[in-house]
Amino acid sequence: MDLFEYQAKELFAKHNVPTTPGRVTDTAEDAKAIAEEIGKPVMVKAQVKVGGRGKAGGVKYAATADDAFTHAQNILGLDIKGHVVKKLLVAEASDIAEEYYISFLLDRANRTYLAMCSVEGGVEIEEVAATKPDRLARIPVDATKGVDEAFAREIAEKGHLPAEVLDAAAVTIAKLWEVFVGEDATLVEVNPLVRTPDDQILALDGKVTLDANADFRHPEHAEFEDRDATDPLELKAKENDLNYVKLDGQVGIIGNGAGLVMSTLDVVAYAGEKHNGVKPANFLDIGGGASAEVMANGLDVILNDSQVKSVFVNVFGGITACDAVANGIVKALEILGEEANKPLVVRLDGNRVEEGRKILADANHPLVVLAQTMDEGADKAAELANK
């Protein structure tokens, strides 16, 4: 989960990373009030999860509270690379002597953590990597050892930070590592990390990506969810612990196991070529649990997608046997009642498949169509979606 800057700075404050005071708001009037409270010049910053805010006019210096009001009026509603500004961060402006770059990230290619540091901050780091690669240090981090102040100083030194700020920078870099590990992040980035005229080190910006797989360890992270930007169906699925991704097709997909669901998407897309270009409407993996409740929740999400014209349930029985899946489908249809109003093609295979098919056949639900193979099921679901 990508965070807004103001949310990243909340985590920075939690771990004592030095930054500038400020508050988030969604009105120009409140922006003025915050500037008055701070009592000094402020920065009015658009809160969007995309780079290039400054070039797009989304970051402005305000010498007075009235300036903050005017800038807030202009920035709210601004479209920055397809992201409409709905919130602003009003933060105390800082005198800047130098700008640096620091980040910690998960280096998937090398299966390790990576620190990146550069004396060339305040610009796109990709530009530095392309034009001045020798100015960008990449330092692997041993997960078993982490980053203490001594190693943080080494990171700063390799990033060519001036000798007179190495100690202060090391303290901040070590605290940023605490954010990275303590919050189960996959990215913590500060650009710029600034040196003030009196040699303070401040995180003026912040970018944090949290690992959703660690949400169970951080219930407090739920408050960071951007509900306005999240598809309501994906939000509903997440609330029910369903692994769901919305796509742009007409055939709803339910399967058990990510590999089977991915294969089902391919087979449905192929079958759809014969039926006016019908495509899969979603990815939905119910995993090993096909209880009535899980199946009902999955169907509820898919059937609430107005684009869906048919549903293909493709399950291979293993630990969860096919008869349990079939009972789950029957009970789910009972639970949903009239909300279940689209044809449901079901293909079962594997453990206790005959018993599962018999349960569905005996139920004789008017919406349920049985298929013997995945290809047959995909073709039938695509055909029904094209009617």
Swiss-Prot record:
Organism of derivation = Mycobacterium sp. (strain KMS)
Q: Provide the residue positions that the database annotates as binding ATP.
A: 45, 52-54, 94, 99
Q: Indicate the family of this protein.
A: Belongs to the succinate/malate CoA ligase beta subunit family.
Instruction: Please state the pathway this protein functions in, per its UniProt record.
Output: Carbohydrate metabolism; tricarboxylic acid cycle; succinate from succinyl-CoA (ligase route): step 1/1
Recite the UniProt cofactor note for this protein.
Answer: Binds 1 Mg(2+) ion per subunit.
The record, for Gene3D superfamilies, names:
ATP-grasp fold, A domain, ATP-grasp fold, B domain, Succinyl-CoA synthetase domains
Q: What binding partners and quaternary form does the record give?
A: Heterotetramer of two alpha and two beta subunits.
Xref: PROSITE patterns: ATP_GRASP, SUCCINYL_COA_LIG_3
Q: Which UniProt keywords apply?
A: ATP-binding, Ligase, Magnesium, Metal-binding, Nucleotide-binding, Tricarboxylic acid cycle
Protein name (record): Succinate--CoA ligase [ADP-forming] subunit beta
Q: What is the reaction catalyzed?
A: succinate + ATP + CoA = succinyl-CoA + ADP + phosphate; GTP + succinate + CoA = succinyl-CoA + GDP + phosphate
Q: What class of enzyme is it?
A: ligase
- Bilayer-crossing residues are none
| Pfam families, sorted | ATP-grasp_2, Ligase_CoA
Q: Which domain of life does the UniProt lineage start with?
A: Bacteria
**Its gene?**
sucC
InterPro entries attached here? ATP-grasp, ATP-grasp_succ-CoA_synth-type, ATP_grasp_subdomain_1, Succ-CoA_synthase_bsu_CS, SUCC_ACL_C, Succ_CoA_ligase-like_bsu, Succinyl-CoA_synth-like
